[in-house]
Amino acid sequence: MAKEEFPLKKVCIICAKGTIEDVYATLVMANGAVMEGIETKIFFTFFGLDAITKKQMNSLHTGTVGNPAMRMPGGLPFPTILGMLPGVEAGVSAMMKSTMAKIDIPTVKEFLEMIEAGGGEIYACKLAMDMFKLKKEDLWEGVKDVLTVGDFYEKCGGLQTQIIFT
């Protein structure tokens, strides 16, 4: 009943972390919204910018240190102290990417292209861009604009809008 009275019309997602699991949470939710016909805007800030930076977007890693939810294949526990060992993060990241490829999960770039093709809008944070000394040309070509936080919030205004932080 509530769906008929107040359907979701717009979703604004803020991606502030650059790990595989955080970036993919953003991309999966954004793509799902686009597929449902919901107006979709993504704002990449701080380390989330890695997902839309040409030099970084194919090199995202899994956060192994301090991740109590981390599991090994088959669901076996992964002691967080193992994440500090040299090569573990790279190995876990490679395994995760391999598993994702085997089950046809799109790459970061493919997801961004799908979201953009479906009408989703992708933005970068001006403050984080300045902080990391990035320029618009450093970003994936589908980034619509570099905005301040205030500018992004203006785009997120209106009834039946959700703002999601990942």
Task: For the regions a language model picked out, list residue spans one by one.
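Glycine-rich, aromatic-bearing surface loops/beta-hairpins
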Residues: 124, 137-140, 144-166
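Short, glycine-rich nucleotide/cofactor-binding loops
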Residues: 13-23, 52-53, 99-103
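N-terminal beta-loop-helix "entrance" segment that forms/cooperates
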Residues: 48-61
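A glycine-rich helix N-cap at a beta->alpha junction
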Residues: 60-96, 100, 104
